[in-house]
Structures are given as structure tokens and as C-alpha cells.
Amino acid sequence: MIDSELSLRWMRNYSGDSLLLHEQEFYRYWLRYYNENFEARFGLQKIVFGTSQLLRTLSWFDSIDPMDPIGQTSGVKALRLRWFPMHNLSSWNWIIASKDDTLSYGGRIEFSNTIGEWGFTYHTDPSKSIKSISSINTSVLGSDSRFAIDYRFDGLIGLWNESALIQSNRSKVVTMTLGADYTLPISTGLLLTVEYMSMQNQFDYATRDSKFLALMASIPLGITHQIMMVSQMNIGEEKLYHFLRWSSTYNYYSLNFICTIYPKRSSYQYHDQFLHQSLAGFGTGLQVMFIYNH
């Protein structure tokens, strides 16, 4: 069978009278052929894999944020092939076009057995530009090769791990995420998720170690409402980030009330040129988001 998608995104974000973001671009355009054992997709698409939800070691080609009610992610211009030779085995291959007109390529194998679900991923990128990888915005200098393994076990408690090595001619990044989730029998079920990330970034003659901890709790209230809370901590810098959202979802629209408590702007030990000029994203914030689906 053959299908396709074409969609546009137009976005303007304001903070007071300051324009923070203005985007008007294609969001997706792709053509796909698929059958029971094979899928080929070509065009601007999303490529997402891995088991983590908050501290995502394998966020190589996407910008998914679990705190974003829209759930959109940036795409890549790529040819992606997937094979399904067995019900518990799949193979991915891709070629991605970068913004500086170079081609990167890679692949992934996924399989499951009695002790869990496994994934093995490889990718190489010859681009010489500085690249930002994962939800923590790790910087990689120069062309690089990436190796990763991820695992998930679903039992009484869900457990998962993502581990990756990103090696370039100027830097070496080793990242690991450990996570677990459990549903408490409270009301309709309180889902608790905790993740820990350890990251070591070696570039030139310097080494930087970072550690992060994240906790997410969510509970549905009937079939319409849901409350979600996320707290993250940068352990080395002792900074806390808190997020609370009440969502109400109806047939054609949803309403989201969001409260954030982030460190104040004055607590960051960075030059002003590395911080955006608006106060949005610092201190305490309140947001109301209306989403219409048609």
C-alpha cells in the first residue's frame, strides 16, 4: 500500500510584547510504501526510538518533550527502511540529509524475548558542524559515530536503560539513563516514573560530568481530566525545575493549565549572550493553552 502526508506549521510565541519565536515552514511531507513485512518512507519525517521518557539518551533526531501538550517534534529529511522478518524482530536503516548538505546514515535492530525488549543502534555523521544531541543538549564537535544499546522490562515494575557512546575527532560523550515506573492503586491509578541520567563529555583537553534526576507523576480524573507533575534536578548545579499541568480533553479540543517553577535568571552562571532575553523560562510562570483538533 502507498500513503503520504503533507502538513505545515505556523507558530508565533510571545512573552509580553516580545516575539520569542516565529516559524512558518513544512512540518511533514513524506511518501510511504508498506506491506506486512516491509516499510519505506521518504521525505521530512520523524525518527524516534528508545525507552526513556524524560531524560532521553537516544533523542538523536527528535525534540519530543513529554511536558508539551501538543506533542510535536522536529523532523528530518530522510529515507527510512524497516523490515519485520519475525513478530519479535525488526530492522531499521536510514539515510538523513543534514542542513549543510551532507548525508549521515545508520541502523537499528529491535528484538524481544522472555526477559525484555532490546535495541541496538548505530549512526555515523560526517558533518563538521557542532551538533546538539539528546534532551540535555549535549554538544558534539566534528564528524561523529554513535553506538547505543537500550533495554526495557515490563513486570510488576517497569525498568529500562539507555546507554550511548558518541565519538568524534574532538569529543567523546558517554551517556546512560536508568528508569523505572510503577502504578499505585490510588483512585484511577497514580503512575510514578523516575529517571536518572549520567553524562560525561570529553572535548579537547577538558572533561565535564553531569548528572540529572527526574520524577513524573500522572493520574487521570475520569475520562476527561488528567493531572501531571514533573520535577527535574541538575544534581551538579543543584537546580530544581518543577512543572504542573491540568489537562481537560474533549472531542475536538483540549484545555491545559500549566504552572512552572524554574530557577531565576540571576542563578545561571553564564554570559548573557547564552541566555534568551525574555524572562520566559525563568522563575515562576503560568500558562493557559487551548488546542483545537479537526
Question: What role is predicted for each listed range?
Answer:
Residues 1-2, 34-37, 66-207:
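Signature for the C-terminal beta-barrel architecture of outer-membrane proteins
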Residues 24-29, 75-79, 103-107, 145-149, ...:
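Hydrophobic, lipid-facing positions within transmembrane beta-strands of outer-membrane proteins
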Residues 10-16, 48-52, 87, 100-102, ...:
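Gram-negative outer-membrane beta-barrel proteins
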Residues 1-90, 111-112, 264:
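Outer membrane beta-barrel
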Residues 81, 248, 253-261, 278-294:
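Outer-membrane beta-barrel "beta-signal"
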Residues 4-10, 42-44, 94-98, 120-124, ...:
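Transmembrane beta-barrel strands of outer-membrane/channel proteins
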Residues 120-127, 133-135, 195, 200-249:
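Outer membrane beta-barrel transmembrane domains
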Residues 14-22, 53-59, 103-106, 130-138, ...:
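Outer-membrane beta-barrel translocator domains and adjoining extracellular loop/strand segments
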